[in-house]
Amino acid sequence: MNLHEYQAKALFAEYGLPVSEGFACDTPQEAVEAAGRIGGDMWVVKCQVHAGGRGKAGGVKVTGSKDEIRAFAEHWLGKNLVTYQTDEKGQPVAKILVESCTDIANELYLGAVVDRSTRRVVFMASTEGGVEIETVAEETPELIHKAIIDPLTGPQPYQARDLGFKLGLNPTQMKQFTKVFMGLAKMFEDHDFALLEINPLVITDEGNIHCLDGKIGIDGNALFRQEKIRDMHDPSQDDAREAHAAKFELNYVALDGNVGCMVNGAGLAMGTMDIVNLHGGKPANFLDVGGGATKERVAEAFKIILSDDNVKAVLVNIFGGIVRCDMIAEGIIGAVKEVGVTVPVVVRLEGTNADLGRDVLASSDLDIIAATSLTDAAEQVVKAAEGK
């Protein structure tokens, strides 16, 4: 689950971190009134969506005119913002953040993630603020400095000072940076974050550290104990198919290919996507139906996959462990009949009663291709998607 910028900054403020005064607004009139409450003669207005690249897409504006604030809000509220991080439809804009304008002397980067290789929370800092951290990691990795948080001792001030020295901060800024670092580390643990980014973390003209942006991702598995964070969820930013899949306990992630994938088990699903890619295809989705591949769940999975108009063929890859393959085959046949699948369907079954399952598929009067191996399945579905 992701948070909007205004929600992230509200959390920053709760932990005593320096953020701009701002208000999230639902209407153009509210946006104009917010500028009046903030005061001054320059403001920043930002579309609130769960995507980066807003500035390049016209979703951020610096202005000294309340009329321009009104026009910006009238233009964007209720519309979709398309950036390089969204699909072609973009993300709906329901709120506009109006903030005081900050004069910037220098831009830095500060972020934290759960690093699986070290099994620790790792903070990253860089002098290359305002740039995608992935770009920095690829082109100039030596400019990314890290601090690994030991879960037994927690974050330590010396780690913040070490990062601060590498960022070239002066003693006053070092103290401010240490406060930000310690506050973010506590916030990360308190609220079960999976990702945290401040890009850019700026040094103002007065020489002070300031959190100019905020990006937060929450571990969805921890939401049961994060009621406050859970209430911040904005369903309008979710992919409609992913949200529908979650209702049926299906793990679905939309992609941009033309081969629909239905698999039981996350590891097998990722392996299936890899082998489809290996044979020249492009997966249209990740979909894990879990351990209970029942007719009902398979039917819903087909409906979700086929709601994507780009899907030209479907690969069903099931390992029968607890559930027998012949029962799974009957479920697939029933689901195909119920949904009215019109694209080619390739099925690969392995495990308990796999041969019997393939016989069940072969004896049906449906156009279902029973593959003999995973390689065969990938080759068949890629050909089918290409119309061969």
Curated annotation (Swiss-Prot):
Pathway as given in its UniProt record: Carbohydrate metabolism; tricarboxylic acid cycle; succinate from succinyl-CoA (ligase route): step 1/1
Source taxon at top rank: Bacteria
GO-annotated biological processes: succinyl-CoA metabolic process; tricarboxylic acid cycle
Any one annotated GO CC term: cytosol
Domain ATP-grasp: 9-244
Keywords recorded for this protein, A-Z: ATP-binding, Ligase, Magnesium, Metal-binding, Nucleotide-binding, Tricarboxylic acid cycle
Cofactor: how bound: Binds 1 Mg(2+) ion per subunit.
Residues given in the record as Mg(2+) binding sites: N199, D213
Keyword ATP-binding: yes
Catalysed transformations (reactions): succinate + ATP + CoA = succinyl-CoA + ADP + phosphate; GTP + succinate + CoA = succinyl-CoA + GDP + phosphate
Binding site for substrate: N264, G321, I322, V323
Subunit organization: Heterotetramer of two alpha and two beta subunits.
Annotated family: Belongs to the succinate/malate CoA ligase beta subunit family.
Function: Succinyl-CoA synthetase functions in the citric acid cycle (TCA), coupling the hydrolysis of succinyl-CoA to the synthesis of either ATP or GTP and thus represents the only step of substrate-level phosphorylation in the TCA. The beta subunit provides nucleotide specificity of the enzyme and binds the substrate succinate, while the binding sites for coenzyme A and phosphate are found in the alpha subunit.
Entry protein name: Succinate--CoA ligase [ADP-forming] subunit beta
Gene source species: Shewanella sediminis (strain HAW-EB3)
